[in-house]
Design a protein with these regions (language model features):
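Active-site-proximal alpha-helix that buttresses catalytic centers in soluble enzyme cores
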Residues: 5-247
Length: 247
């Protein structure tokens, strides 16, 4: 029997609180990331504590409406399972195993890396589930993963999928979902809502905004609706800095 190449696929996502009492620690992890609050540690730590504490009551109300927790882990695990089945079906020369790593809640990189070491792969593929690249999302997750591998002295051939803002299947999936919702084009506005970023991140060269624009333009093009009324907006602004807009 031929030996299969063992390939570990690491799927990165943000994570979310699994219960209401974890909303504040989740928010702290989010804002204590230097890619989010670009400040020295001794400033960032207390500021992250303060922001998390201030935002927790509002965030808790939102999670309450979602049933008391974030659905992101369950949905990402479903994606991971479906991808693993498809990869093993499509490539008979390799044995694929998918692992989920969350940046701001569990499962964290430091725990998942131990499972990957046990799996003992010949190759690792890093796959952020953010279609558009930003240093604050994909960049931060990849950086943390590399740091954890270094700490565990774990060296394996690794390749990284950066981003896929105009991938045809990604565009097609959006088109399908949008078409399902269009009841009457005469009284219809399509609002694209992407997560915002501070403007200074973009000015420093972060490609996120133009990749979001690329995604939206491709989706609009694929819909092929004459005089479609659409707009791109950005959400979730935090702190005093100027963020990209319109909000």
């Amino acid at each position: 029997k031929r030996l299969l190449m063992k390939k570990a696929v690491i799927l990165f996502n943000l994570g979310g609180p699994d219960k209401l009492e974890n909303v504040e620690p989740f928010l702290f992890n989010l804002f204590n990331d230097p890619a989010i609050l670009n400040l020295p540690g001794f400033f960032r730590f207390p500021l992250a504590k303060l922001i998390a504490n201030r935002r927790a009551p509002t965030a808790k109300k939102i999670y309450q409406e979602l049933g008391g927790s974030s659905p992101i882990l369950k949905l990402t695990e479903e994606q991971s399972h479906a991808l693993e089945i498809k990869l093993n079906k499509d490539d008979e020369l390799s044995d694929y195993k998918c692992f989920v790593v969350m940046r701001c809640w569990h499962p964290r990189a430091e725990n998942v890396v131990k499972e990957v070491i046990n799996y003992n792969p010949d190759e690792i593929i890093l796959m952020p589930l953010y279609p558009q690249y930003s240093a604050a999302t994909s960049g931060s997750s990849i950086k943390e993963w590399n740091h954890v591998c270094l700490k565990n002295n774990f060296k394996v051939k690794t390749s990284t999928i950066c981003c896929y803002p105009t991938d045809k299947n990604f565009v097609e999936a959006h088109k399908t979902e949008i078409i399902k919702k269009i009841k009457n084009l005469d009284n219809f506005k399509l609002i694209f809502s992407a997560h915002g970023l501070p403007e200074k991140n973009i000015k420093k060269g972060d490609p996120y905004q133009w990749q979001v624009q690329q995604s939206v333009e491709e989706i609009v093009k694929s819909l092929n609706i004459k005089n479609l009324d659409w707009i791109l907006s950005y959400q979730s602004r935090v702190g005093p800095l100027k963020w990209i807009g319109p909000s």
